[in-house]
Amino acid sequence: MKKTLYLLLALSLLLSLCACSSGLATETPETPKETAEKKSEDASDKKTSIPEGFSTGFAREDVSPYGYSVRMNSTSVANTVKDPIFATCVAVSDGEQIALFFSLDIRNTTKGAQMLSIVSKATGIPKENMFFTATHNHSGPDPTASTSDVAHWYADFYKALSKAAKDAIADLTPSEIFIGKADSPAGTNFVRRYQRADGSWDGIHNENTSKAPVTAYETEADKELRTVRFERGDKKDIVMVNWQAHAAHALSSNNSVITADFITNFRKGVEKEMDVNFAYFQGAAGDINFSSHMNDKKYDGWEEIGSVLVDVAKEAVDNETPASSGKLQITKSVLDGVVRKESAERVKQAKEINKTSLDSEKSALMSKYAFASRYEVSAVIKRAGMGDTSPLPLYCISFGDVAFASAPFEMFGSNGAELRKASPYPMTFNCSYTNGACGYMPSALAFDHGGYEIDTCYFEKGTGERCVNESVRILTEHFSKR
């Protein structure tokens, strides 16, 4: 009996030793929490690597349509690249997360949702952490066109965005921040809405007509130019610039060449004279054009304006002060914009005009039904199909003393200035044409006077001010948590 017991004990010990040597049945099974943590660690290994501390990176991709023609607007097709257009990316990291700021030499970000999705998938960066800001350049591929040539361009464009994002992230370098401001001189930009001696309000490019003389501008032009410079040791500094003026004047209305308008010379000059990397972010330019024949100082055109702005940027950098970095704070807020109501009769008239193919007949019907332009006809039809409200996504990103507030529309200059004045941050960039394209967003004052931008706006009076207030609310909350 004892012999049998000893044999059983020996066999049990042998089995235990075998189990230990093979690693079987000796480890405590993972708890669900431990399993989840392990999966999380595995996933984090696939995410974009983030360096410690505050750092910035820069990259740029040429997105010009080389070798093929491309539609620029309803009447023009470009077949030559006079000056390259670019997708520029500035990456900002606080050591824990990354934000990407894109400056795009295109008219608008109509396909902002696609841009966000594509680059987020390529980099792992959340969509909320990105600004895609158009410079509002009118001399590039038409982002709203559905033609095959523009589709061809978009395919290359999306690849360029992903590459620029990855390269900017790879370029992340420890950085210090400096902020500066300077005013552009008289004549560099002006409010394109004004009152004539007969009391009527006018705008766009009607300055030199035979109509009654201009007696007053609707508001003063916002001339402030803002810079954020990232000093990066042995690597080139990055200078981000925020100013406001339509990039819509290169060559002529029947332009057939690609260029970035005044931003071409602006970029070239800053990078040559300051030996930095440059990124331009369009401000509240909905009612602001550059240059004006009514000012004492006259500029020859878009190329000279770009060169003049180089000196303004240099002055802003000369005026700069050190700024803190701090943690990235990122908020996306979506406002419900109340859509303007259209009468059934007005919609019927617009559709009748839209069905007409002959320009002469269109003009006759527009005159008959008191439509100011074909743009108003399109806006009436679109508003009728939009429902009661439409979402307006507002993105705000801040770090230390610096804040960025975006708008997916053409914000008016007075609203942009109001936003910056109300922001608690020492430096605020207000970026229009960002992450979407909702057309013009006139100020409440402009609604009172009427005109082209009001005729084509999709939303009710006061929506622009609502967006300003919401952005200020977010930035105030961010500032309190710095």
Where are these regions (language model features)?
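Positively charged n-region of N-terminal signal peptides that target proteins for export
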Residues: 1-8
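Bacterial N-terminal signal peptides
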Residues: 8-16
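Sec-dependent signal peptide cleavage junction
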Residues: 15-34
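Ser/Thr-rich, Pro/Gly/Ala-heavy low-complexity intrinsically disordered linkers and tails
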Residues: 32-43
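Conserved beta-alpha junction segments in alpha/beta enzyme cores
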Residues: 45-134, 141-278, 283-285, 289-304, ...
